[in-house]
């Protein structure tokens, strides 16, 4: 799991990552051009959305199922705290006990019963290349194909996280080819779910490998339905590092989730406040590590003591009840039928999301607010209508520009708002 590194390695690695990130932003292809077929959870313009097009921002907790299968109430307990996602640790049988297809089906049923999205991950790949007991992404793909019967038809509820932290700090550059190959193998086998891929370097990508190659990995997926996951521990001990990494993905329309993080770690002191605040401001998902059951000196990462939902640790209380935490920011997936409505969540008739904080997000009283780095509609306000002027969708499928021609300095009918292209109503592009 979170492997310690030297300070020198961190400094050199982050400098290299910054250089690679700059190169990628110059020459990398735009990943937001192609979109997945409208089935299940998918990627659209660099955002994670549900089948109905509603954006879904993960606010979840990791659960170590494969080591604690007897903790049968954990899923319900996590959901009761307000999480909308549970990332579930599975075993492929290569290192840890294999999670069978029937067990996978049971876990998905639990997710659905508790109205959370299931991110299912194979943990046996952790630290491959540096940890001799770890297995390959190719073997992880074989596992997913072997439990295909449990996954089919569950695309609305399940994200397949191919392999946890699939490379350590040895030969991390091989991550790109191995990840592309695993994605292709799963697509060729008929798995059309949203896929999630973890970064190398024990998930922390201090080498910048995922950052530099994410666009090409995304483009290699014929479904264009791959979500990137960064794990933020000691490498991300300043707000600047957190913001730089997440902003790179958002600005390049590459879907990113913080798949693991904590408030402390043996390799440094992660800035959990910056992680949560930045994720909230960008509309990026996060999944904290972990509910309970940690050992080997990292017991401080438990959110509850001994799987007791009524015994929150300091980390658990901060993550669940603190600023930008689960209680304040989590919204249930709309596939469950109660994740929206018209009071603080859901989608307005003009296609824009409702403001979670209502009129508090609208200081000038025009009916439009600003949350998660995008415009939102105040329920019941003057903007809470349909039409094609200042919201809604143009005939070509792109949203209309809220600010009209003000968003179109070159006068070609196309504007740029909320990190995506928009159409100026009545312009030459409005067709």
Located regions from the model:
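A recurrent domain-boundary module in secreted/ectodomain proteins
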Residues: 310-341, 374-384, 422-428
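Secretory targeting and sorting signals
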Residues: 2-34
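N-terminal carbohydrate-binding accessory modules
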Residues: 32-85, 325, 331, 335, ...
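Solvent-exposed, acidic/flexible segments
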Residues: 67, 97-101, 133, 137-140, ...
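Extracellular glycoside hydrolase catalytic/binding regions
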Residues: 40-41, 68-72, 137-145, 149-159, ...
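N-terminal presequences and immediately downstream first alpha-helices
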Residues: 11-17, 34-52, 58, 172-184, ...
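Aromatic-lined substrate-binding rim segments of carbohydrate-active enzymes
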Residues: 71-129, 137-142, 180, 184-190, ...
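Extracellular/cell-surface secretome signature
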Residues: 345-431
């Amino acid at each position: 799991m979170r492997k310690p590194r030297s300070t020198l390695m961190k400094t050199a690695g982050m400098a290299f990552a910054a250089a690679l990130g700059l190169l990628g932003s110059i020459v990398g292809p735009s990943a937001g051009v192609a979109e997945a077929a409208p089935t299940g959870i998918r990627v659209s313009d660099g955002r994670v959305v549900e089948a109905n097009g509603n954006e879904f921002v993960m606010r979840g907790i990791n659960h170590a199922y494969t080591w604690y299968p007897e903790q049968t109430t954990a899923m319900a307990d996590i959901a009761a705290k307000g999480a909308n996602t549970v990332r579930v640790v599975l075993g492929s049988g290569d290192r840890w006990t294999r999670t069978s297809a029937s067990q996978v089906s049971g876990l998905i049923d639990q997710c659905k019963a508790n109205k959370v999205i299931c991110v299912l991950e194979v943990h046996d790949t952790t630290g491959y290349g540096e940890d001799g007991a770890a297995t390959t992404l190719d073997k992880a793909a074989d596992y997913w194909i072997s439990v295909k019967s449990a996954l089919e038809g569950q695309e609305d509820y399940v994200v397949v996280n191919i392999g946890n932290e699939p490379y350590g700090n040895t030969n991390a550059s091989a991550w790109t080819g191995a990840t592309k190959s695993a994605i292709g193998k799963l697509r060729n086998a008929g798995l059309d779910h949203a896929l999630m891929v973890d970064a190398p370097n024990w998930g922390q990508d201090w080498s910048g490998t995922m950052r530099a190659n994410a666009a090409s990995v995304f483009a290699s997926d014929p479904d264009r339905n791959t979500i990137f996951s960064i794990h933020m521990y000691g490498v991300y001990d300043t707000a600047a590092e957190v913001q730089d990494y997440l902003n790179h993905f958002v600005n390049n329309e590459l879907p990113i989730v913080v798949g693991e993080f904590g408030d402390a770690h043996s390799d440094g002191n992660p800035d959990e406040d910056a992680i949560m605040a930045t994720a909230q401001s960008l509309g990026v998902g996060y999944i904290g590590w972990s509910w309970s059951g940690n050992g080997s000196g990292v017991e401080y990462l438990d959110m509850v003591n001994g799987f007791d939902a009524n015994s929150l640790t300091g980390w658990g209380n901060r993550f669940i009840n603190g600023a930008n935490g689960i209680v304040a920011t989590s919204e249930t997936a709309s596939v469950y039928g109660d994740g929206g409505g018209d009071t603080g969540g859901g989608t307005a008739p003009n296609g824009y999301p409702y403001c979670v904080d209502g009129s508090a997000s609208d200081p000038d009283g025009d009916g439009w607010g600003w949350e998660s780095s995008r415009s939102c509609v105040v329920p019941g306000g003057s903007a809470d209508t349909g039409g094609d002027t200042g919201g809604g969708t143009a005939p070509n499928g792109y949203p209309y520009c809220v600010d009209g021609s003000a968003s179109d300095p070159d006068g070609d009918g196309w504007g740029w708002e909320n990190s995506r292209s928009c159409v100026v109503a009545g312009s030459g592009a409005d067709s």
